[in-house]
A protein has these predicted regions:
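Flexible, low-complexity junctional segments that flank or bridge functional domains
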Residues: 1-179
Length: 179
């Protein structure tokens, strides 16, 4: 299958792309971006290692059916995703400060560089966690206000189900999400 796909790209794609080093590197970049679109799981050193090890020959490897590179990268991705979930679950057991001043979370990281260190990476993960907790807290408050208004004046419901959503705290919601 990999060989057939590579041959189609190489010979029959409407852009008439050749699977040379440049195209191989672009395919590798697209693969990495598909796994880690926010550049928050892989480290810069890992991406550089993948590019050095697999980049120029990614297309040739696909042509020959050699999927060792994509499988190795995907294995690292799965391991890092597991670390991310474990980190989030461990942090959810600790009290979180939701009233931080001057904290900034870069939410659109598609064009951002990969983190150089796990310290930078975990700082981003922590900001993501706090942001998710704040968003869930606000959503819960809005839902409670909506339910209160609907119960006080059922005609506002206009046929809607008046039962509220599952009654979970933001921490419980995220714990459920990451398990």
């Amino acid at each position: 299958m990999a060989r057939q796909l590579a041959t189609l790209v190489d010979r029959q794609h409407y852009l008439n792309l050749r699977l040379d080093a440049t195209t191989s590197n672009r395919i590798l970049d697209m693969y990495l971006d598909s796994l880690d679109p926010d550049h928050s799981l892989f480290l810069a050193s890992e991406v550089e290692e993948y590019k050095n090890k697999y980049g120029a020959n990614f297309g040739v490897a696909l042509k020959t059916g050699n999927l060792a590179g994509p499988f190795a990268i995907h294995a690292q991705y799965r391991e890092r995703l597991k670390q991310f979930y474990e980190y989030m679950l461990a942090e959810l057991k600790k009290p979180q400060n939701l009233q931080q001043k001057d904290a900034y979370l870069e939410v659109d990281r598609e064009k951002s560089a990969y983190f150089k260190t796990t310290t930078e990476q975990k700082a981003q993960w922590q900001k993501m966690l706090v942001s998710q907790l704040i968003n869930l807290t606000i959503a819960k408050e809005e839902e409670l206000a909506k339910q209160k208004a609907l119960k006080a004046n059922p005609s506002l419901a206009n046929g809607q189900d008046l039962t509220g959503p599952e009654d979970l705290t933001p921490v419980q919601t995220l714990t459920k999400r990451y398990t």
